[in-house]
Amino acid sequence: MADFNSPIQYLKEDSRDRTSIGSLEYDENSDTIIPSFAAGLEDFEPIPSPTTTSTSLYSQLTHNMEKIAEEEDINFLHDTREFTSLVPEETDNKPEDDEESGAKPKKKKHLFPKLSSHKSK
C-alpha cells in the first residue's frame, strides 16, 4: 500500500513552457489524489445537478437571450439619434439626369487620381 502521508511529486508545464515541480496530495474524504493547486475546488460543481433537465436549461438560456435582446433593442432605440446625421437627405440620393437637360455628362472623379491617371487618358 502506498504511503499517503508524503506527497507525490510530478513535473508540470505551464503556458510558457516552463517546467516546475507540482505535488499530489491525498484527500481522505474522496479517496482520490488531487493536485495541490486544486485545493479548495472540491465543492465546485461544474456539472448540473440531476434535477436540472436539458429542457429547463434550454428554456433558461432562451429566456436569458430574449432578455438580452430586449435590452439591446431598448439601447438601440435610445441611441438612434447618433446615426441620423449619417443618413443622407432624399435630395442627395437622386442622381442628376444630365441627358434630359442636354448637358454633357460629367466625368467621374477618381478616388485615387495618381493610380488611375494612366487609364483615364
From Swiss-Prot:
Gene Ontology cellular component list: virion component
Key words, A-Z: Acetylation, DNA-binding, Host-virus interaction, Inhibition of host innate immune response by virus, Inhibition of host IRF3 by virus, Inhibition of host RLR pathway by virus, Late protein, Viral immunoevasion, Viral release from host cell, Virion
One MF annotation (Gene Ontology) recorded for this entry: DNA binding
Ranges for region Disordered: 1-24, 84-121
A GO biological process held by the record: symbiont-mediated suppression of host cytoplasmic pattern recognition receptor signaling pathway via inhibition of IRF3 activity
Residues found modified as N-acetylalanine: 2
Compartments, as annotated in UniProt: Virion
Keyword Plastid applies: no
Biased composition annotated in UniProt, kind: Basic residues: 104-121
Induction: Expressed in the late phase of the viral replicative cycle.
Subcellular location, principal: virion
Post-translational note: Acetylated.
Coiled-coil regions, chain positions: none
Keyword DNA-binding: yes
Subunit field text: Interacts with the major capsid protein. Interacts with host IRF3; this interaction interferes with the recruitment of IRF3 to TBK1.
Family: Belongs to the asfivirus structural protein p14.5 family.
Function: Structural protein required for transport of intracellular particles from the assembly sites to the plasma membrane. Binds to both ssDNA and dsDNA. Suppressed the activation of the cGAS/STING pathway by interfering with the recruitment of IRF3 to TBK1, which in turn suppresses IRF3 phosphorylation, decreasing interferon production.
Protein name per UniProt: Structural protein p14.5
Organism: African swine fever virus (isolate Tick/South Africa/Pretoriuskop Pr4/1996) (ASFV)
Lineage per the UniProt record: Viruses, Varidnaviria, Bamfordvirae, Nucleocytoviricota, Pokkesviricetes
